[in-house]
From Swiss-Prot:
Zn(2+) binds at residues 27, 208, 233, 237. Keywords: Aminoacyl-tRNA synthetase, ATP-binding, Cytoplasm, Ligase, Metal-binding, Nucleotide-binding, Protein biosynthesis, Zinc. It comes from Maridesulfovibrio salexigens (strain ATCC 14822 / DSM 2638 / NCIMB 8403 / VKM B-1763) (Desulfovibrio salexigens). It is found in: Cytoplasm. This is Cysteine--tRNA ligase. The keyword Transport does not apply.
Length: 485
C-alpha cells in the first residue's frame, strides 16, 4: 500500500515498523461543542484507514485522544455555568452518539488529557533538562523553537518566515516570539494541577506528545489528523517528542483535506457552519458517510445539500440493486449454461481495480467506482434472459454480492439489509419534503381503487398528484409500489 506522507510530500510504500503490528495515533476532538462535518470527515477517513489495514491482515492498535482541558473548554464552561470537566464529559458523550450513527468504530485506546498530567509534567521536565525549554518567573514553561534544528520539516516552513510574523504579546515572558507554551501558569477560576513550576495546566501541543509516547514506543507507524493540524500542532508535537527522545516521532504523517462550503472553508463567522446533527436531521447517517467517500481524502470536499441529495441517489441505487440481486437468487432451477468469458473478466477487472484504488493512497472514490461497475453488471445479467436463468449468472451474482459485502465492511457502507434500509430512506426523504406517509398511502389506495373501477382518468389524476408531491408509483404483480423521486 502506498500512502501520502506529509513529512516527505510524496506517496511512499507503507511498511510497518514492527512486523505485522501497526500503531496509529489520530488527534481527536476538543470537547467543547457538537461535532461538525469537518470532524465527521476526519473520523471517517481514519476509521477507513484502520478498517483497511485490518482487512489486509495487520494487527492495528488505534489511539485517538480527547482534549478535555483547553482555553475553548474553559471559556465555554464559564459562559454556561458548569465546570470544565462537566462540559467536556457532556460533549465526549455527544461525540459518541454522532460517531456511532456514522458507523465509526471505537478506537482501541481513547486517552483524555486530564488523565495524563504526570506524563506531561515528566516530558516538560525532560525538555528543560535538555535545554529545549525554560520556565518563566510566573510559572509558564515555553519550548525553545530555535533549539530544534528540524523545526518546520513537516509543514515546510522556515524559521525566517515564521519570525517575520511572530510577536511577543504584552505580559508574556517568552525569550523568543517563536516559542510556544508547554505549561501554562494557573489563572483564577481555571482548573490547574500541581507541578514543579507551580499550579498550572498543559499546553495543547504537549498533550498529544505525552499521550502518544505513553501508548506507543517511538517511532510509531502513523500519526494522523486534519490538514489544519499540520501546523502548528503537529509541527510542535514533532519538536517536543523528538527533542526529548532523540528519536523520530512517527514514520508517516497522514492528513485529510478540508470540508468547504461553496469553495470556502467552513466557519461559524461566515455563517456556513453545519454540525453533524444539522445534517442528520435531514439525511440518513449512511448517506453522509457515503458522501464523505466520494472525494479523495486529501482533496478539499465541497459540501452542499444538493451534493448530499446526489449521494442519496447513489446509495439508493446500490441498495436497490442489492435487493433485486438477492431476490433474483431465490430461484430454484438454473440452466447449466456459463456466462461469456468477457463478463467474468469484467468482474475480475473490478476486483483488481478496487484493490488497486485502495492500495493507491486509499482512493475511496476510485474504489467505489469499481463497486458501481459490479452493480451495473448485476443489472445486465438480470436483463439478459439466458444469463439470469443460468448457473453462470447465479454464480456471478453470488460473487458480486460477496464482493460488495466484503468491500462494504471496509468502507462502512452498504452493509445493512437492503429492504430495511430502503424503507427507512423512503421515510427520511418524505419527512424532508414535509409529506406524511399516511397522505401518500391514502392517495396510492385511491388510485388502486380507481384502477379497479376502470376509472383511468381519475387514476391518472392521482398519479399526477403524487408526482407533484415527489412520489412515483409503479404497478407490479404484487400490487402498487411507491417510491420518492
Amino acid at each position: 500500500m502506498r500512502l501520502y506522507n506529509t513529512l516527505n510530500r510524496k506517496k511512499e510504500e507503507f511498511v510497518p515498523l514492527n512486523g505485522n503490528k501497526v500503531n496509529l495515533y489520530a488527534c481527536g476532538i476538543t470537547a467543547y461543542d457538537l461535532c461538525h462535518i469537518g470532524h465527521a470527515r476526519s473520523s471517517v477517513v481514519f476509521d477507513i484507514l484502520v478498517r483497511y489495514l485490518r482487512f489486509k491482515g495487520y494487527d492495528v492498535t488505534f489511539v485517538r485522544n480527547f482534549t478535555d482541558i483547553d482555553d475553548k473548554i474553559i471559556n465555554r464552561a464559564n459562559e454556561t455555568g458548569v465546570t470544565s470537566t462537566e462540559l467536556a464529559e457532556k460533549f465526549i458523550g455527544e461525540f459518541y452518539v454522532d460517531m456511532d450513527k456514522l458507523n465509526i468504530l471505537r478506537a482501541d485506546i481513547e486517552p483524555k488529557c486530564t488523565e495524563h498530567i504526570p506524563e506531561m509534567i515528566e516530558l516538560t521536565q525532560t525538555l528543560i533538562e535538555k535545554d529545549h525549554a525554560y520556565a518563566t518567573p510566573s510559572g509558564d514553561v515555553y519550548f525553545k523553537v530555535r533549539s530544534f534544528d528540524d523545526y518546520g520539516k513537516l509543514s515546510g516552513r522556515n524559521i525566517e518566515d515564521l519570525q517575520s510574523g511572530a510577536r511577543i504579546q504584552p505580559g508574556e515572558e517568552k525569550q523568543d516570539p517563536l516559542d510556544f507554551a508547554l505549561w501554562k501558569a494557573a489563572k483564577p477560576g481555571e482548573p490547574s494541577w500541581e507541578s514543579p513550576w507551580g499550579q498550572g495546566r498543559p499546553g495543547w501541543h504537549l498533550e498529544c506528545s505525552a499521550m502518544s509516547e505513553k501508548y506507543f514506543e517511538l517511532p510509531f507507524d502513523i500519526h494522523g489528523g486534519g490538514q489544519d493540524l499540520s501546523f502548528p500542532h503537529h509541527e510542535n508535537e514533532i519538536a517536543q517528542s523528538e527533542a526529548a527522545t532523540g528519536k523520530e516521532m512517527a514514520r508517516f504523517w497522514v492528513h485529510n483535506g478540508f470540508v468547504q462550503i461553496n469553495s470556502e472553508k467552513m466557519s461559524k463567522s461566515l455563517g456556513n457552519f453545519f454540525t453533524i446533527r444539522d445534517i442528520l436531521d435531514k439525511f440518513m447517517p449512511e448517506t453522509l458517510r457515503y458522501f464523505l467517500l466520494t472525494m479523495h481524502y486529501r482533496s478539499p470536499l465541497d459540501f452542499s445539500f444538493e451534493a448530499l441529495e446526489e449521494a442519496e441517489k447513489g446509495i439508493r441505487r446500490v441498495y436497490s440493486a442489492l435487493e433485486q440481486t438477492a431476490e433474483a437468487l431465490n430461484k430454484s432451477k438454473w440452466s447449466k449454461a456459463a456466462l461469456p468469458e468477457e463478463v467474468l473478466a469484467e468482474i475480475e477487472d473490478a476486483e483488481k481495480g478496487w484493490a488497486d484504488a485502495m492500495e493507491d493512497d486509499m482512493n475511496t472514490a476510485g474504489a467505489m467506482g469499481h463497486m458501481f461497475t459490479l452493480i451495473r453488471l448485476a443489472g445486465r445479467i438480470g436483463e439478459e434472459k439466458s444469463w439470469r436463468k443460468s448457473e453462470g449468472g447465479r454464480d456471478a451474482w453470488i460473487r458480486i454480492l460477496e464482493d460488495m459485502k466484503k468491500w462494504g465492511e471496509v468502507l462502512g457502507i452498504f452493509t445493512r439489509d437492503p429492504k430495511e434500509f430502503l424503507e427507512e430512506l423512503k421515510l427520511c426523504m418524505l419527512e424532508r419534503k414535509g409529506i406524511e406517509v399516511a397522505k401518500v398511502e391514502e392517495l396510492v389506495a385511491a388510485r388502486q381503487e380507481a384502477r379497479k373501477n376502470k376509472d383511468f382518468a381519475r387514476s391518472d389524476e392521482i398519479r399526477d398528484e403524487l408526482i407533484e408531491l415527489g412520489v412515483e408509483v409503479k404497478d407490479t404483480p404484487q400490487g402498487a409500489v411507491w417510491s420518492v423521486i
